């Protein structure tokens, strides 16, 4: 039995060497994107890009992280406006106009005008400053829901102090995007999408006496938590795709090629329907 325990210890030690431990010296990379990003950049091209404004895309959930030491940490990222703007740009269907930092932009333009009024001042913006562009469509919405532990589960077994277990947890983040006609205030279309955030843990261990006064204790575990910002970005990417597809179906905008509606990505999202619980 003693030799069997030592053999088990060697096996578990060998497994521990195969665990993919992140390298703390890794260089910064571009933000990771989900599978919906591939669909976003594979859409048919538009007949003409649409000028849109995004004033605010905020967290409307009021949810905080459940950890006792994180009472002031929100459950979802607070940079929703930046993520939505990125998705609109990546789709190549829209020209987002700066509105979140509008006050900063207006202040900078005042500085330019003040410099232009002085004859002896050198201006790098010429003698005239063009007007700001206006949007045809306003994109409204926000992060409307964050549900924790919508699914949980696990399995485990232990015999004579030796065994293993695994468990998982699923959360869900939901976003809403609305396209609003600037001239009339009419809501042209509205889309709500959800993305599941999966976390799981696998562990194994042994705790038993292998001989008189000789105790064997071994623990091995691995956890994986899907980053919330990537899940949120995927939900926003999907919402933008649905917004484009619904707009084409309703005649709000058109693809450059009429045959674009036969695009596999277009047909995939056009055929999606709301799930009925």
Where are the language model's segments positioned?
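Short alpha-helical segments and helix-capping/turn motifs at coil-helix boundaries
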Residues: 1, 35-39, 123-125
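Sec-dependent signal peptide recognition
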Residues: 1-8
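Conserved aromatic-histidine-acidic binding/catalytic patches
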Residues: 3, 72, 76, 223, ...
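C-terminal/domain-edge helix-coil "capping" segments
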Residues: 15-49, 147, 154, 167-277
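N-terminal segment of the mature soluble domain
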Residues: 50-51, 55-149, 172, 176, ...
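Extracellular loop and loop/strand-boundary signature of outer-membrane beta-barrel proteins
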Residues: 126-127, 161-165
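Charged, amphipathic alpha-helical segments
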Residues: 144-161
């Amino acid at each position: 039995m003693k030799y069997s325990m030592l053999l088990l210890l060697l096996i578990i030690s060998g497994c521990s060497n195969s665990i993919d431990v992140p390298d703390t010296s890794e260089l910064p990379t571009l933000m990771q994107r989900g599978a919906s990003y591939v669909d976003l950049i594979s859409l048919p091209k538009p007949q003409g890009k649409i000028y849109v404004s995004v004033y605010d895309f905020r967290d409307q959930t009021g949810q905080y992280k459940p950890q006792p030491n994180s009472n002031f940490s929100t459950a979802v990222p607070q940079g929703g406006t930046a993520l939505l703007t990125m998705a609109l740009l990546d789709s190549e269907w829209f020209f987002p106009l700066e509105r979140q930092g509008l006050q900063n932009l207006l202040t900078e333009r005042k500085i330019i005008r003040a410099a232009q009024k002085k004859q002896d001042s050198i201006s790098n913006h010429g003698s005239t400053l063009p007007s700001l562009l206006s949007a045809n469509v306003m994109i409204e919405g926000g992060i409307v829901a964050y549900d924790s532990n919508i699914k949980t589960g696990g399995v485990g077994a232990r015999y004579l102090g030796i065994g293993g277990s695994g468990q998982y947890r699923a959360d869900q983040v939901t976003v809403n995007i609305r396209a609003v006609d600037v001239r009339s205030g009419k809501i042209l279309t509205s889309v709500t999408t959800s993305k599941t955030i999966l976390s799981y843990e696998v562990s194994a261990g042994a705790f038993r006496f292998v001989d008189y006064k000789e105790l064997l204790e071994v623990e091995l575990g691995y956890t994986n938590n899907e980053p919330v910002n990537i899940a949120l970005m995927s939900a926003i990417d999907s919402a933008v795709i649905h917004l484009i597809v619904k707009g084409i179906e309703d005649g709000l905008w058109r693809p450059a090629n009429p045959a674009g509606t036969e695009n596999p990505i277009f047909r995939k999202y056009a055929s999606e329907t709301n799930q009925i619980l």
